Amino acid sequence: LPILRIDLIHIHHLRNMYLDIFKVAQEKNVPFIYTMHDFYSICPSVKLFDEETFLCNYNNQNGCSSCISKKFKLNINFIPLWRKEFYSNLKLAKKIIVPSSNTKNIVLDIYKDLTIDVIEHGYNQANKESNYSNIKKNKKEKFNIAFIGGISEEKGLRYLKGLIAEARKSEITIHLFGMAENKKYNTNKQNYIYHGEYLQKDLPNLLLENDIKLVCLMSMWPETYSYTLSESLIAEIPVITFDLGAIAERVKAIDAGWIFPIHSTAKDIFKFILTVKSNIAGEYQKKKENIRHYLKEMKSVKEMANEYARIYNKTINTFPVLAYDTNDTQSKIEFYKKSRELNPSSIKSIQEKKEYKRIKNIIKGSAPFKRAFREMKLYRETYKNSKWRNKILFKFIWYRIICLNTCSTFTKKYY
């Protein structure tokens, strides 16, 4: 961190990593913010999904034993220790951010005294093709519904199976844009069309071209946001989902679809789809109108980035860290004000010179040979056009090779 002059660390995920980054940041006096994209800080299974009961009872740590045994092949309930470690580190964050209020509430159920901000993800609306002549309509006017993304058990695979079975010999056609975990469903069947993988930017138009009337987002874990929902809304298509997580939160907020209890059956959902089909001019059109109204104010990626930029600037400028010179206690905001007064080449020259002096002191000092060599090498790789590039190599050769060999020869000769 000191070598790279890091002013702020933004952590997005730590899966397959150690938690050392928290302690190193604190030791080096570097502030960090943490954005939670899932529930890894609560359980390493990430999704809070129980294959037997669907809903994870995350508040009851004693009930975690059987789940841990199945998912991690361990007979030790390590969740209390896991949460203790995460909590002690999360308290050090200057800001904790989540993409939905539902996610915030779940995290606060476990870590009750944390301060958490909600910043919804942004999404850039693609230009939808207005040429509806591309729409693929069946002679019998089939009613098309779609599943989107990678459909695993926790993403509602059992409902894809169930609805395919119900749709046989009906006027309902089911489409899958993406792939199913069970390869059996990665091929066409009666009243079922498998489209396979797609580019994210193409999805809204794919939904329109295939005349999709409803999108089924049947996640069985509390998703923290859902870009597939955003893509469905951009295509102005109402959705069916469960009363769970950020998807339900967002659908309720704009009345963009229908929400079912988590233990609803595929038969229940199919019956409802038939009622929507029979009354396509009624409530369905109201949902579409709500979506159109929402799209006028839908947050863009740029707007989201601006929210984060404000947090970055506020955190960097107010955190009491030392500037480049360890003897200079000016605040970061003063440093950046001075930087703006200089042209980029002047700033780079100052950085090169300061770094040269720092590494020269390391070479001349008592630091281990390997560290001195590593610092010298990194400087030469970083500042390839610097006028100090060859000087630092000479300093290393002089102090670490010539001087040491001379001293060694002198010692052997006279002592």
Descriptions of predicted regions:
Residues 214-217, 238-241:
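Short hydrophobic beta-strand element within catalytic cores of glycosyltransferases
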Residues 216-227, 248-249:
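Nucleotide-sugar-dependent
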Residues 267, 281-317:
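A charged, aromatic-enriched C-terminal amphipathic alpha-helix characteristic of glycosyltransferases
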Residues 138-155, 161-164:
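Conserved donor-binding/catalytic core segment of Leloir-type glycosyltransferases
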Residues 27, 57-95:
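Membrane-proximal helix-turn-helix segments that form the acceptor-binding/catalytic region
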Residues 181-210:
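Nucleotide-activated donor-binding/catalytic signature segment of Leloir-type glycosyltransferases, i.e.
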Residues 87-88, 92, 104-124:
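Helix-loop-beta element that forms the nucleotide-linked donor phosphate-binding surface
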